[in-house]
Amino acid sequence: MSTTTYRSICGEESLPYIDCDRCIRALYARLQHYVQQDRGDCPICAYFREKIGSRDGSESDARLLLHAQVNVVYELFARHADQEALALLERIEDDCC
């Protein structure tokens, strides 16, 4: 009986993994940027201000927030037409979740 693994499908090519922690920190920083730039007219930013609250922004906080709120994060980046952040979010969903 053989086991199917990623390596058995891809062969010996280098694995296309990303540095999940670094990418999550970058995406969290982008989220914080939009929240900080908000002048009070973005309900999504207000939502995240409440969710972030007094959290310290540690990796575990960032990871939990992004995983739990992925659809709302997507909506925020889509509203700002931030294609780079949207692509990174998709990559994090695929490779890190």
Swiss-Prot record:
Transmembrane segments: none annotated. GO terms for biological process: nitrogen fixation. It comes from the Bacteria. Pfam families: CowN. Keywords: Nitrogen fixation. The keyword Heme does not apply. Belongs to the CowN family. Is required to sustain N(2)-dependent growth in the presence of low levels of carbon monoxide (CO). Probably acts by protecting the N(2) fixation ability of the nitrogenase complex, which is inactivated in the presence of CO. This is N(2)-fixation sustaining protein CowN. It comes from Azotobacter vinelandii (strain DJ / ATCC BAA-1303). The gene is cowN.
